[in-house]
UniProtKB/Swiss-Prot annotation:
The gene is GET1. It comes from Saccharomyces cerevisiae (strain ATCC 204508 / S288c) (Baker's yeast). Component of the Golgi to ER traffic (GET) complex, which is composed of GET1, GET2 and GET3. Within the complex, GET1 and GET2 form a heterotetramer which is stabilized by phosphatidylinositol binding and which binds to the GET3 homodimer. It is a multi-pass membrane protein. Pfam families: CHD5. GO terms for molecular function: protein transmembrane transporter activity; protein-membrane adaptor activity. GO terms for cellular component: endoplasmic reticulum; endoplasmic reticulum membrane; GET complex; Golgi membrane; mitochondrial membrane; mitochondrion. The chain crosses the membrane at residues 2-21, 105-125, 182-198. Present with 2250 molecules/cell in log phase SD medium. Residues 22-104, 199-235 are cytoplasmic. Required for the post-translational delivery of tail-anchored (TA) proteins to the endoplasmic reticulum. Together with GET2, acts as a membrane receptor for soluble GET3, which recognizes and selectively binds the transmembrane domain of TA proteins in the cytosol. The GET complex cooperates with the HDEL receptor ERD2 to mediate the ATP-dependent retrieval of resident ER proteins that contain a C-terminal H-D-E-L retention signal from the Golgi to the ER. Involved in mitochondrial distribution and morphology. This is Golgi to ER traffic protein 1. The keyword Transport applies.
Length: 235
């Protein structure tokens, strides 16, 4: 396997792993986010409030009015603390998620994009001369040079006909040897389409819940016919 293809597969595997495990990210983030200590404090306050509420419900407000009132004031104070802690946790988790998104962008998305731009025309798969001749030159050109060939092919035709900039778009730029290969950009594009196709099939066959048939709704005409039938029977 060509080294460029191996690097591309690495980026794709990491990207797909993050995509498939997306529903677990929030749980993972909660373990490493700065708000973890706040979460412990939040849970402790919730537990304290629950115990105090149960104790207050177990005593008589008339017989222990002073204590019951004091506990009620403390419950109000705990409610405010719990709400403030909840807001702080959500704020810190959002900030942490934003940092992770930037990290993913800088460490994965941008490097993969730059890699495809720099090495997009690198041949990663060689075609035999007999195989390459089975397809039109235009198709082989797209395989070897990428989608840019769609724009360059007309320019190449014009340059050959009018002898304009032959060094840029002529035969020397797209020789027969160069057209007998598949470039990294097209190879990655084809691989991603295959993966997406398999994902779609698996999702439709195994992961999509079955929809029940809609209940039949009696139309106005059917109701009218039923009414006529009933009238005939009564007569």
């Amino acid at each position: 396997m060509h080294w460029a293809a191996a690097v591309a597969i690495f980026f794709i595997v990491v990207t797909k792993f993050l995509q498939y495990t997306n529903k677990y990210h929030e749980k993972w983030i909660s373990k490493f986010a700065p708000g973890n200590e706040l979460s412990k404090k939040y849970l402790a306050k919730v537990k304290e409030r629950h115990e105090l509420k149960e104790f207050n419900n177990s005593i008589s407000a008339q017989d222990n009015y002073a204590k019951w009132t004091k506990n009620n004031r403390k419950l109000d104070s705990l409610d405010k603390e719990i709400n403030n802690l909840k807001d702080e946790i959500q704020s810190e988790n959002k900030a942490f998620q934003a940092h992770l998104h930037k990290l993913r962008l800088l460490a994965l998305t941008v490097p993969f994009f730059v890699f495809k731009i720099m090495y997009g025309k690198t041949p990663v798969y060689k075609l035999s001369s007999s195989t390459s001749t089975l397809f039109p030159t235009f198709v082989s050109g797209v395989w070897s040079q990428g989608w840019l060939y769609v724009l360059l092919h007309p320019l190449r035709t014009i340059s050959q006909k009018w002898h304009i900039m032959e060094g840029k778009f002529g035969a020397s730029k797209f020789d027969d040897m160069a057209l007998q290969s598949v470039s990294l950009g097209i190879w990655v594009w084809a691989l991603m389409n295959v993966i997406n196709g398999v994902e779609f099939i698996v999702k439709q066959l195994f992961l999509t819940p079955k929809m029940e048939a809609p209940a039949s709704v009696e139309t106005q005409e059917e109701k009218a016919l039923d009414a006529v039938d009933d009238a005939i029977i009564l007569d």
